[in-house]
Amino acid sequence: MYKKTTLGLIICLLSCSLWAKGKAGIDLTLIPPATITNQVDLDIRVGITNYDISVRSLDVSLYLNKIDRNTLLYHSTCQVEKDNPLTIRYNMQTRDKVGKNKIILVVKDGTKKTIQTRDIEIIDSNIRSTRLIDGAWTSIYHWSETEGKHWNNDLRRMTDDQWREMIRSMHKVGMDIIVIQEVFRNEQYVGKHDITVETYQGKAFYPSDLYEGRMEIAAKDPVEAILAEADKHGMHVMMGVGMFAWFDFTPESLEWHKRVAKELWDKYGHHPSFYGFYVSEESGGGLDNWEKTPEKRQIRKNDIVNFFAEFKKFCNRMAPAKPIMLATNSMDVPNGKETYPELLKNLDILCPFGFARMPENDLTGKQAATMLQKLCNDAGSHLWFDLEAFLFNEDQSLYPRPIEQIIHDLNLFDNFEKILCYQFPGVFNDPKMSIRVGEKRTVDLFEGYQKYRERILYNRKAGIKNEIVSTKTVQGTWLNLPYQDVRNKYMNPFHVDCTAPAFWKQKIKEYSDIGLEYLVIMAVANERQAYYPSSFMKYAYPSNRQSPVEAIMEAADQYGMKVFMSCGWAVNQDDNIREPAIKELQQKIMKETADLFKEHINPEKPDVPLNKNDAFQKVQKRHVQEKR
């Protein structure tokens, strides 16, 4: 059950401003920004800091679309002390507010009046998701040389102007929330280092005054370039406060994050596009860093709760309306279920990833999303989706995910109020940019997503709600093992050994890569010769190697695909199953293949043979990696 309209006034015991260093002491923030559906309430936040006198008496009002008594959402008279900023939080229901709207903040300070506005478009829908990618992560240089193999060299040579180009390209496809992955590079892990704030050796992506180390990149200040260009297009930038060390929420990490967050706010807080703070360290869904002992696991859980309680308090001293976001993976969430309520008290946005690659013996991606949604609802926090727009090559380098798979996830996970993707550089490429970051297929993904988005926007304008927009992609294919007649001339040519296990393992990988999920084996036998290790038929393949059917089943397990097993041919493709002898032989093949390949059936939910088309389906869970 989602939160009803509530009004809260939170006075934060902090230290901050009405004007100082070029930053206004009044800030209006919408969570989520820009576009939402009318199934999502709008979290309106006002932050006020008094930089001048001891106490300031203010009259604060919020209006919808115009300043009028009938459009008043909220009003109060507030006393704002110096060193004691004020946060006002108003939750607005949106069901009856479809269309383009404007939230108007009016703050009166005696005779002085300050007005700020924020646009919000509310889409008529019966689901929470907009089914579009509303933003993306941006690594100025990817943290892993292995994963970033195909694009890190390109990122290294990008200039400030080319970073501005990239921001324009993101805006072109509506990815208007930019999450800077990190502003320092330091490849360390919690529990594996003895770094302190003073001994930190990380390298900055911007001209930091805190530490001397600099990343060796062509751009002089890509952070400034990103923010300045985002200002021009009304975009929103989550500033990546990191990296101290992966998964590290210890007190030393907290102190480092405070110092870096303050420097980032001092240097860049005047930018209208500076939307909030993103803590780069990430966490497992269980919140315990996969520690081996109960004591260690509890320490990690306590660390992350204490970190965000203190970091939130610190950031509110500088910027009381700015949200804080963390990305966790979606795995092992039940293990952290008792810790999430305390964590989410001080975490505005949880943005988990990995739903498409859940491990065995865990929740499904959909179940994990539902559990996290309830936890966030109960805490009054926001749940966004970090959609992975990449896949792993065998060498663990990343490459663009097929657009069909991305569209599938955009339509499957419909509870998220905002969908961001990881990541834009090296995965998407605008063909009009002066530099291509990564492989040629990054351009294909950009153009494929652009077409999908245009269709969604067209449907919105036409009043079509929640049509599943895709090209009605092929979800499966038949597999022919024998060469039977001239029709197989091009599919199973004589010069190709279609019984070789390596051949089929490669083919199944290719089918998985292009988004196929179902495999239908046309025939497992022909002319009384079997393509599997039969006990009553001769082998149609060399007996000293794995059968093609075994190779197909193993590869299907590896890539999480589903196989419909054939029960023929008893003799050949002209089998007449009305003849008792043919029917008996096909049933014998069915029983034998069921016995041979039963280990490929999901042990939790064994599937029974399907009568349709004399085939049966083998279903198994996906085998996936646990890291991003």
PLM regions and their residue ranges:
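Short, compositionally biased P/S/T/A/G/V-rich stretches that sit at domain boundaries
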Residues: 21-47, 327-328
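Active-site clefts of carbohydrate-active enzymes
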Residues: 144-145, 245, 375-405, 485-486, ...
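Catalytic domains of carbohydrate-active enzymes, especially glycoside hydrolases
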Residues: 156-187, 348-350, 419, 499-527
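Aromatic-lined carbohydrate-binding/catalytic grooves of carbohydrate-active enzymes
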Residues: 175-217, 514-546
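Aromatic-lined carbohydrate-recognition surfaces of secreted/lumenal glycan-active proteins
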Residues: 238-251, 278, 308-336, 380-392, ...
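Active-site groove signature of glycoside hydrolases
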Residues: 243-248, 261-298, 525, 569-576, ...
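Aromatic- and acid-rich polysaccharide-binding/catalytic face
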Residues: 272-285, 335-363, 424
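Substrate-binding cleft of secreted/luminal carbohydrate-active enzymes
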Residues: 359, 381-460, 518
